[in-house]
């Protein structure tokens, strides 16, 4: 699967290239060129996450390794469902995204993202450094994301 820039003039990249590039060189965001579909039923959150998102990896990470990365990413969440959907009133539901290690919704993405960076960089024999500035809660999530 190729990733394309939202501004349209950057070169197409594969998963690893888009992951490590962050922003496209034309200032756009890299997004998937196509959107595959997946069916999941009754699996754990980590297993569903692996099944749904692995097609976006385009074979750069074997599925068994990818599933293990997902399981590790969500193992520190305080709720067995990771992000339970709770009925708060008849026909009114709330998706609880605060059960991660920093109690912020960003944990849902960053716990996996950090592991993806670690895997790809190790596979390439490279190291990375992320420098960031924040005035909010993002810093604590990144710090706990194993990047």
Features from the language model and the residues they span:
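PLP-dependent amino-acid enzyme catalytic core
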Residues: 1-144
């Amino acid at each position: 699967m190729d990733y394309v820039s939202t501004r349209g003039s950057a070169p197409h990249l594969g998963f690893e290239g888009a992951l490590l590039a962050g922003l496209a060189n034309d200032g756009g965001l890299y997004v998937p060129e196509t959107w595959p579909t997946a069916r999941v039923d009754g699996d754990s959150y980590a297993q569903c996450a692996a099944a749904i998102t692995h097609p976006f990896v385009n074979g750069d990470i074997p599925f068994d390794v990818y599933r293990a990365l997902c399981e590790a990413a969500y193992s520190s969440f305080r709720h067995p469902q990771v992000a339970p959907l709770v009925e708060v009133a008849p026909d009114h539901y709330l998706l609880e995204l605060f059960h991660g290690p920093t109690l912020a919704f960003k944990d849902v993405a960053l716990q996996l993202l950090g592991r993806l960076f670690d895997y790809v960089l190790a596979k390439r024999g490279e190291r990375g450094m992320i420098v960031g500035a924040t005035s909010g809660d993002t810093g604590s999530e990144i710090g706990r994301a194993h990047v």
